[in-house]
């Protein structure tokens, strides 16, 4: 099993790189909007900053589409290794950009890497993991993302934009050097009729030679899945697939409309508007640490508590937290003295991150890795990633505009409503998948679709 954990850790170095792309925005935008980095030739207006923050989501849509087209041709491992190319190109372009156009292109390229990575990594991890620890290993991806975010939050305020990008180059290079030696997904190998290679992959991943029964189960599952067509009709017309798609689409919208993207990208700016004694950059660091700690907690409890219960608790908790922030800014907007309750929005934001990390951060990702059948997994994942990126783009670009026109409290009230609605949807429609094999999950979805 050592090779399994090594494969999961190495594979998640790509997710750490995703986290660094996401985390770069908060400290860097604060510097570039205020013109504090004299050595960097680009300074941003609020509108330009919104585009820099949101362009990776458009690149992510393109990346998800590309990944869906090529993942079953080149395999999970090769596609994961390919993400190193746009990652390195993007960081180098950011470091040496001399115009706003070049910075825009670099962020779109970063989105390509993010979109491909977020599509292929959960598929790979879901297919190499045994059922009893699949939740832990897929949650590890979100831990890796949050480590990447924390690195940028901690060192970003103290480095120049260019030096920060050079540090960020380490993760994709390290990922390539380690991951190249690890095995391909046994499910993908079996789909290529490479039974001997499948057994070799399982031997490496399980650390034992007696993998014949598992290989036979994989062969039956892959054969049954691939006997069906791989197209939109199969995804939309088969009741269990359609139910799965609707569940994951709604979860994606709930996740992105919960407010996390606004808080992540504009954390330092939001904290600076609270008029608290501690500088925004230090509060942002605290935010990153809290997020990492609670994501690690989630990783260890997800296969005990279950995906569904964590999602419900997370939605209720984030709703209460954003309501606290909205209340403070609502009072401030109406010129009511808030001097004695400056603790309220800080508590709300930190509590939000705690509750988001416990469920909404990782559980949709875990479900994505296990809920689609083989024949429509790439197609379904592509649609989900496109939906996520679209709503992420909407939240990032509209937050500053709505906050400027109507007040900061308005977007936070919207986030509150979406989180409460999300808790209700999850309670009534999302199935529990903990401890089940991929085959058992499909049988359960087929049973639910007949009711």
Regions flagged by a language model, labelled:
Residues 206-207:
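Short helix/loop segments within enzyme catalytic domains
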Residues 1-197, 201-203, 224-451:
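Alpha-helical transmembrane bundle of multi-pass membrane proteins
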């Amino acid at each position: 099993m050592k090779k399994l954990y090594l494969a999961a850790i190495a594979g998640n170095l790509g997710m750490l790189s995703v986290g660094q792309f996401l985390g770069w925005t908060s400290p860097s935008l604060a510097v570039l909007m205020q013109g504090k980095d004299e050595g960097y030739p680009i300074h941003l207006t609020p509108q330009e900053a919104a585009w820099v923050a949101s362009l990776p989501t458009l690149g992510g849509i393109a990346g998800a589409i590309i990944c869906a087209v090529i993942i079953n041709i080149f395999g999970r491992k090769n596609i994961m290794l390919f993400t190193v190319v746009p990652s390195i190109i993007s960081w180098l372009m950011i470091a040496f950009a001399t115009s706003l156009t070049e910075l825009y292109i670099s962020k779109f390229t970063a989105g390509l890497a993010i979109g491909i990575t977020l599509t292929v990594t959960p598929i790979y991890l879901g297919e190499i993991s045994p059922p009893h620890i699949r939740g832990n290993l897929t949650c590890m991806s979100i831990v890796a993302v949050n480590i990447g975010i924390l690195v940028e939050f901690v060192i970003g305020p103290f480095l120049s934009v260019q030096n920060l990008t050079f540090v960020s180059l380490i993760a994709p290079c390290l990922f390539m050097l380690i991951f190249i030696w690890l095995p391909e997904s046994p499910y993908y190998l079996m789909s290529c009729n490479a039974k001997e290679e499948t057994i070799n992959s399982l031997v490496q991943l399980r650390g034992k030679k007696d993998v014949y029964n598992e290989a036979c189960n994989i062969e039956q599952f892959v054969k049954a899945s691939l006997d069906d067509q791989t197209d939109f009709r199969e995804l939309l017309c088969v009741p269990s697939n359609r139910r799965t798609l609707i569940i994951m689409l709604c979860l994606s919208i709930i996740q992105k409309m919960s407010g996390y993207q606004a808080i992540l990208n504009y954390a330092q700016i939001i904290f600076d508007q609270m008029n608290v004694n501690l500088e925004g950059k230090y509060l942002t660091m605290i935010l990153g640490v809290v997020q990492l700690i609670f994501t690690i907690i989630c990783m260890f409890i997800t296969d005990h508590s279950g995906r569904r219960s964590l999602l419900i608790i997370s939605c209720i908790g984030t709703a209460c937290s954003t309501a606290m922030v909205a209340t403070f800014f609502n009072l401030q907007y109406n010129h009511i003295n808030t001097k004695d309750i400056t603790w309220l929005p800080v508590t709300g934001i930190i509590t939000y991150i705690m509750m988001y990390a416990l469920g909404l951060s990782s559980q949709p990702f875990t479900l994505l890795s296990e809920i689609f059948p083989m024949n429509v997994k790439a197609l379904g994942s592509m649609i989900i990633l496109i939906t996520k990126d679209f709503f992420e783009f909407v939240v990032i670009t509209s937050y500053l505009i709505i906050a400027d026109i109507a007040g900061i409290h308005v977007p936070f009230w919207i986030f509150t409503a979406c989180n409460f609605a999300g808790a209700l949807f999850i309670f009534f429609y999302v199935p529990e998948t903990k401890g089940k094999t991929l085959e058992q999950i499909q049988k359960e979805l087929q049973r639910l679709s007949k009711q």
